[in-house]
Amino acid sequence: MAEIIENRLRKLRIRKGYSQIKVQMETGIDQSDYSKMEHGKRYPTMDQAKQLSRLFDTSIDYIYGITDESAPYPRSDKNFEKKKK
């Protein structure tokens, strides 16, 4: 699993043209922690995976290797739900 996560995080970051420092600036995840994720030395927490999925326009399931579909799930619009009632 670590190899899947590290490869996907690296590919997603490079596809966006971001450095690890840019990821830190956008998410607040410390660069050294993010580097450890890309090298398979630690896993992202659920909160970190959520931040990364938003930054990279993908799903948490894709980051964790649960699916091979990199497209993000549709985001729910809570205001839309309120308007329907």
Regions found by a protein language model. Name each.
Residues 17-39:
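Short alpha-helical DNA-recognition segment
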Residues 15, 64-85:
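Short, charged recognition helix plus adjacent turn
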Residues 1-15:
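A short, Lys/Arg-rich alpha-helix, primarily the initiator
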Residues 13, 24, 53:
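The alpha-helix within a helix-turn-helix
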Residues 28, 47-62:
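DNA major-groove recognition helix of helix-turn-helix/homeodomain DNA-binding modules
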Residues 8, 33-36, 48, 62:
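Residue-level recognition of specific faces of alpha-helices
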